Amino acid sequence: MEMPREGDYIAIQSYKHNGTLHRNWRDTMVVKTEQNIIIGVNDRTLITEEDGRKWISREPAIVYFHRKLWFNVIAMLRPDGVAYYANLASPFILDREALKYIDYDLDIKVFPDGEKRLLDADEYAMNKKRWHYSEEIDSILRSTSFELLDWIDQKKGPFARKFVQIWYERYNQLRPDLDRSFFKGRENEERKILGT
């Protein structure tokens, strides 16, 4: 399938190694595409969990996906600053239905103050055993963890300060419903979070 264009909405589907659908984001606006990269924004997006529970995201989030990297990144714009959630996951594929990837359980969360935390190591150990992750996948994910920490420390790619500002501004240029902005009436808060 050809890459979506800026302003298009796509669904994002996260699967587990055994092929089960883990989570679905219904409407993500694409703000940038390159040969191997899709950057999008979720803003009050309907999310459906594997057990059927549905909820709406509370704050805008910029998502970064790469066809060759074994992680994806969510930058969440929160009142106290930008927090990052990096999923160790397969590179994405794209078909008519959605952007899809396999979630490999491990996550690195970066708080607005810069603190980093590895999450779900116990879930990874359990699923590795249950679903027989290969040694190759285990090795890729271990090396990717170090690569990801390096990106975070060097403020590379989606962790660069300007990344959030640039792509959130682009989102606001593309969206037809600007009066629904998360920051409507709170522009000073927006400037503080984005560092503008």
UniProtKB/Swiss-Prot annotation:
| Catalytic reactions of this protein | a ribonucleoside 5'-triphosphate + H2O = a ribonucleoside 5'-diphosphate + phosphate + H(+); a ribonucleoside 5'-diphosphate + H2O = a ribonucleoside 5'-phosphate + phosphate + H(+)
Q: Where does Mg(2+) 2 bind?
A: 105, 107, 120, 123
Q: Which Pfam families match?
A: DUF402
Catalytic center at which residues?
23
What GO molecular function annotations does the UniProt record carry, in alphabetical order?
magnesium ion binding; nucleoside diphosphate phosphatase activity; ribonucleoside triphosphate phosphatase activity
Keyword entries, A-Z: Hydrolase, Magnesium, Metal-binding
Q: Which InterPro entries does this one have?
A: DUF402 (IPR007295), FomD-like_sf (IPR035930), Ntdp-like (IPR050212), SA1684 (IPR016882)
Q: Where does Mg(2+) 1 bind?
A: 87, 103, 107
The UniProt function text for this chain reads: Has nucleoside phosphatase activity towards nucleoside triphosphates and nucleoside diphosphates.
HAMAP family per UniProt? Ntdp (MF_01568)
Q: Which PANTHER family match?
A: PTHR39159, UPF0374 PROTEIN YGAC
Similarity annotation? Belongs to the Ntdp family.
What protein am I looking at? Nucleoside triphosphate/diphosphate phosphatase
What is the organism of origin for this protein? Answer: Lactobacillus johnsonii (strain CNCM I-12250 / La1 / NCC 533)
| Lineage, uppermost ranks | Bacteria, Bacillati, Bacillota, Bacilli, Lactobacillales
